[in-house]
Amino acid sequence: MGSKNRIAKHLLPIMLENRNGRTWVEPFVGGANMIDKVDGKRIGADFNEYVISLFTGIQNGFIPPSEVNEEEYKQARLNRVVTPLISFIGFGCSYSGKWFGGYARGNTNKGQPRNYCLESKKNILKQSENLKGVEFIHSSYQNLQIPSNSLIYCDPPYEGTTKYKDGFSHAEFWEW
C-alpha cells in the first residue's frame, strides 16, 4: 500500500476520535505521512537510521538540494554516512522513493524531463511545518520506550513484498 498520505483523511478521524490528549506513537514512522497530520505530543520512531536522520535534519533547518545528478547519486550510494543529505538522496532521488532503488528519471506527460529531486524537496519542505514538535527516535519497535496511555499506530513493513535491509519478522511483530 505504501504511503498513507492519500488515505490519512479517512483513517485519522476514526483513530483520533477518542485520543483525548494521549501521546501519538508511530513505531514505523516511514515517510511520516500520518504523524504529520496529528496535533499534540507525537513520537515517530523507525529502525532505519536514515529516515530519522532526514526528518531530524529537516527539523533542524536542513534544506535539500534542488538537483542531484546521476554521478552525485552514485557517489552518495557509495558514501552511506548517516547525514540528512545522504538520507534525502537515498530516498528522494530514487525510483519510487525506495532506498537507493535506482536513480529516478523520466519525463512529464508533455515529454519534458522530470526533476524528481526537486519534487521530493518541495514535498518534504511542505511537510516540514507539520513535523515541528515531533520527537523522532531511531529505535526498533521492540526497544521503543512508549509512554503509558499512548495511542499507537503501527504500519509495519508489508509481508511478501519488498525485502528489507535488516529483515523483518512478522511473526515476532504479531507476538509483540
Identify the role of each PLM range.
Residues 2-3, 42:
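A short N-terminal beta->alpha junction/helix N-cap motif
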Residues 3-20:
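Conserved alpha-helix/loop element of class I SAM-dependent methyltransferases that forms part
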Residues 17, 33, 57-61:
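Short helix-loop boundary/capping segments at the starts of domains
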Residues 17-23, 147-148:
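Short helix-loop-beta connector
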Residues 40-136, 142-143:
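Class I S-adenosyl-L-methionine-dependent methyltransferase module
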Residues 165-176:
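Glycine-rich S-adenosyl-L-methionine
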